[in-house]
């Protein structure tokens, strides 16, 4: 029997981006016009639901960053997941202000997000520049901890299967910036 005991692991890697790279991305976000984030993969007609997801987003197209993200996805997939992955979606910068949050959700589902396999989140903000805004997973990790909170270290990347339930807790003070993207593949088999 073929097994993959690591199929739901969450990978953390510090220093994916330097402090100066994070600051540069935050400045880029603030220099452009962002939009309210919508819900994806739903049949709900109300795609702007700030009770569920309250954040601003901006698509960024930067070749060096995209290539670096693809490489880390591929390495994580080879070492841990062994999923059938093919292409990366666009990269988005996110800004959570006071009251900003994203309730429990998964990154794969119906329609346009049905082939997402892996998710990545890069922490751009300094960990002490905001309160709340924790990335939490609603699973038990390899040490038996459930609903655990991931790292807030600036420049760190978190990679995880798109089907894992997770959330961003409400921001109570300050601003949280992050970068997100996903790796897609053929239909789950």
Listing of model-derived features with the role each one plays in the protein:
Residues 70, 74-189:
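Catalytic core of non-heme Fe(II) oxygenases with the double-stranded beta-helix
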Residues 1-85, 101:
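Non-heme Fe(II)/2-oxoglutarate
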């Amino acid at each position: 029997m073929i097994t993959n005991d690591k199929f739901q692991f969450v990978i953390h890697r510090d220093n994916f981006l330097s402090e100066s790279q994070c600051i540069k991305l935050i400045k880029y976000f603030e220099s452009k016009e962002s939009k309210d984030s919508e819900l994806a993969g739903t049949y709900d007609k109300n795609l702007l639901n700030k009770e569920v997801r309250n954040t601003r987003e901006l698509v960024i197209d930067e070749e060096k960053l995209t290539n670096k993200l693809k490489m880390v996805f591929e390495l994580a997939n080879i070492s841990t997941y062994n999923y059938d992955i093919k292409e990366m979606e666009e990269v988005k910068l996110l800004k959570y202000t006071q009251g900003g949050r994203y309730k429990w959700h998964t990154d794969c589902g119906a329609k346009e997000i049905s082939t997402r396999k892996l998710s990545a989140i890069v922490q751009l903000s300094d960990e002490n520049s905001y309160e709340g805004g924790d990335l939490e997973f609603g699973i038990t990790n390899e040490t038996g901890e459930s609903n655990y909170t991931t790292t807030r270290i600036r420049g760190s990347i978190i990679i995880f299967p798109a089907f894992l339930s997770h959330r961003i807790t409400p921001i109570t003070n300050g601003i949280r910036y992050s970068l997100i993207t996903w790796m897609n593949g053929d239909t789950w088999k």
